[in-house]
Amino acid sequence: RTAWLYSEFGKNFCKTMMSLTATKPQLKVVFDQCGTPTYALDLAKAIAQILDDYSKETKANNYFKTGVYHYSNEGVCSWYDFTKMIAEYNGTTACDVQPCHSNEFPSPVTRPSFSVLDKTKIKETFGIRIPYWTESLKQCITNIKNNK
């Protein structure tokens, strides 16, 4: 399982906020929903490591550790915190990003206020090193800017 997925490709929160903070004078973003952003490249690397382990383990023992595993980057932030870091790493200073309550954006779906995933099992089972979300966000934004 994963959460708050973003990358250089397709439509996602990171790319949307890069655009909005570069073009809007003010932006309201919820601060009362917390989770952890997941950089798709980090997730892909973790999956590749697991597949490599799978290949070695099944050849050696005809057995592999199965189950439900959680993966997201390390750390915790709100959507507001995430947006502020996106603007900072993008070099956007003109937009006034303001925190707001989620009830200011009515939704037919109830969103959890805390959706941080416990990654202990995937780290202990496969020895995966998971980068901190700010480190990965900076890499993603650098990649986006270099590929324009």
Where are these regions (language model features)?
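Residues that recognize and position ribonucleotide moieties
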Residues: 27, 36, 75, 98, ...
